[in-house]
């Protein structure tokens, strides 16, 4: 997800899981408009794109969040000319394999679904996808279309988070959209969100 409340969904999920005692890493994989570094107060001069472009030590990527020892952050790094190529690289696959071996939860803050190439690439690398929708922004038909397209390429869709609903609002037909990707450990098959057609509530994974 990118920016605003979509971005906050990934961040809040990572923080909640880390507060529960799990080892968590969150990655900014929006290589076109990165924002995660700003939220956590990190420099973005070095990050994921440096690693994917040839710097092979993943330990240099991990930025500890001082206020929450269980949480590690990987910022995007400098914006590259070839985001899709980097995300589909063997280096990206190897990095996720390394992280899944060493962390209970790996949460990827992804580009908006409108950038479908990046979203599709990431969806094939992770255990599951969560759609984060914004009330009042785009049609539910469009959300369902993206959901179907991800399903067609074999992505496991955990469910949908709907943000931005006002208690006084009666207009539920239009939503914004973006995707978050979650990669829990292989030995933990419990999804963060139950599979639903529209909206679900978040469940803490076991462990």
Residue ranges and their predicted role:
Residues 1-207:
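P-loop NTP-binding module
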